[in-house]
Design a protein with these regions (language model features):
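Non-catalytic alpha/beta scaffold blocks inside enzyme catalytic domains
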Residues: 1-33, 37-53, 61-66, 74, ...
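Structured loops at beta-to-helix junctions and adjacent beta-edge loops in soluble globular domains
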Residues: 37, 60, 129, 315, ...
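Long, low-complexity segments enriched in small/aliphatic residues
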Residues: 255-327
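Conserved hydrophobic/aromatic pocket- or pore-lining residues that grip, position, or stack substrates
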Residues: 57
Length: 327
């Protein structure tokens, strides 16, 4: 029954136009590039199938991972290696990932205040990070109601770069840095290669270059704005005296038993960027010094057809249009 005429009836697109598009896609072959960014996949009954069908066209033309085709964005993004990472969680908070939505890929935070209101549980301590649900979500009034009830949110700390509606309902408002006030790694799927860039807090780096280094970023930032990484390091060491299994994930990889610093964190990461140690050494620099100086590093100029060697991260190692795992 799946004819061009049937598709016209379902979609409103003329049958002859559908046939013409199909021929053009076939002619493009491996140079067919397309993907579904929300669009019909969001808020439509059966919309989840749109991305599957569109990707199947890429499969049929052999364009998956090909030059001029469509690649997984993870092929073009650098994934950093962190010191002392915790083991994956063995269970989840059903206030964030409710049983009603077993295939949810992201935390369904828009439902949280409604679950609290139903009496499903309590958030003893809640950090809202660069997040303004009172304004952003459709039912901001329920968030306001729950934030005002200490039996639902015991303590609410808002980590935010701005004063906003959600911060108004917080017990603590903790100013977080904007782009020029913090360290970050950047790596985006901008083209067929893979790269990593290093964002640095401007005033801290300026102070270091002028011979006036600081220990913590907030000492250089206006308004004592904290570096998030340092905030979590400090908070974790204050929460855990070493008996709770938290502090061990915030230890220096170079000074056993000591608290990790922001410089050590990024030095550890950059030491493990493929090709960077050799390039930095050629300039007489450490990996961190190289990234401070240059700001970016090209890891791979092109990343095509990796699946031919690595397969896919599915039970079968193949792309699964029909998946026994989901069924």
């Amino acid at each position: 029954i799946f004819t061009p005429e049937y598709a016209e009836k379902e979609s409103g697109v003329k049958a002859d136009m559908i046939v013409e598009i199909a021929h053009k896609i076939g002619e493009a072959g491996e140079r067919f590039a397309s993907h579904n960014w929300r669009a019909a996949g969001a808020s439509n009954l059966g919309g989840w199938a749109v991305a599957r069908c569109l990707h199947f066209l890429t499969v049929l033309t052999g364009a998956v991972g090909a030059k001029g085709g469509t690649s997984p964005n993870s092929w073009n993004k650098f994934k950093p290696t962190q010191p002392n990472p915790p083991a994956p969680q063995k269970k989840w908070n059903e206030l964030h990932f409710p049983k009603e939505y077993p295939l949810a890929f992201f935390e369904m935070s828009q439902l949280l205040p409604h679950f609290l209101k139903e009496g499903r549980g309590k958030m003893d301590v809640y950090f809202s990070r660069v997040f303004n649900p009172v304004w952003t979500y459709p039912d901001g009034f329920t968030w306001m109601e729950m934030f005002s009830d200490e039996t639902k949110f015991g303590l609410h700390a808002a980590l935010t770069p701005t004063w906003n509606e959600t911060a108004f309902f917080a017990d603590f408002v903790l100013p977080m840095g904007l782009a020029s006030e913090r360290h970050d790694l950047n790596s985006y799927a901008t083209h067929g290669g893979t790269w990593v860039a290093f964002r640095q807090p401007v005033l801290r780096e300026a102070a270091r270059r002028n011979g006036k280094p600081v220990s913590l970023t907030y000492e250089a930032n206006p308004g004592e704005v904290w570096e998030e990484d340092e905030f979590w390091n400090e908070l974790s060491w204050r929460i855990d005296d070493g008996t709770m299994g938290i502090r061990e994930h915030f230890m220096s990889p170079y000074r056993p038993g000591e608290k990790i610093t922001i410089d050590e964190y990024y030095q550890y990461t950059f030491e493990r960027v493929p090709g960077l140690p050799e390039v930095a050494k050629a300039e007489g620099l450490t990996e961190l010094e190289y990234m401070r100086k240059h700001g970016a590093f090209l890891i791979e100029p092109a990343t095509y057809k990796k699946h031919e060697q690595e397969g896919w991260p599915t039970p079968s190692g193949k792309q699964e249009l029909y998946s026994k795992t989901i069924v």
